[in-house]
């Protein structure tokens, strides 16, 4: 029996579109407007933006388009983008440590002025309960485990003053005046306790200067 041929256009995957030029569902204009708003924000205050929608509504595609738009903007206005997918770390003992470890690894790697920021994030992570060993658990960031391990060794004999570390980290961000965009997707795929843990750490870090959070999730599932 001859099998029916299926046109390629009818096939799709769970992977989001990443190029606005290939936009089939009209997400690009909204993503462009959102990227422009993020790039144009001149204040030093931290911002948290949320993109709500059910599964399959195009949230991940919008996030990808926003990152694409920001990459091709004026260099002086480009934020340092850190993408974090908590679903990769789902089931780990401490999701918050994975998130801080990602920031620690990515920020200095993408912007030289953030080397001290990365060190302070390691100390801040340690002050919140010890640095987790994340070696080999961060996709696409092979240095993450080594960075966190070295941070743990430095913190072994140091007193941990969370308010002082937070103040020092805020001071460095104010000095650099470089906007950071933290993109977090697939929050609604986490277990309820993991969602609470992630939102708790975001709340604790939301007031850092020059840091913008862009979150995507199904509000009916994650909240």
Outline where the language-model segments fall.
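Short, flexible/disordered secondary-structure transition segments
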Residues: 45, 110-114, 213
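Conserved Walker B catalytic segment
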Residues: 161-220
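A short acidic (Asp/Glu
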Residues: 62-64, 94-95, 192-196, 223
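Non-catalytic regulatory/linker segments of enzymes
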Residues: 4-12, 76-78, 102, 143-144, ...
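Conserved phosphate/pyrophosphate-binding and hydrolysis machinery centered on Walker-type P-loop NTPases
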Residues: 20, 24-28, 52, 56, ...
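Walker A/P-loop-proximal flanking segment of P-loop NTPase domains
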Residues: 1-89, 97, 205
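P-loop NTPase nucleotide-binding core
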Residues: 63-175
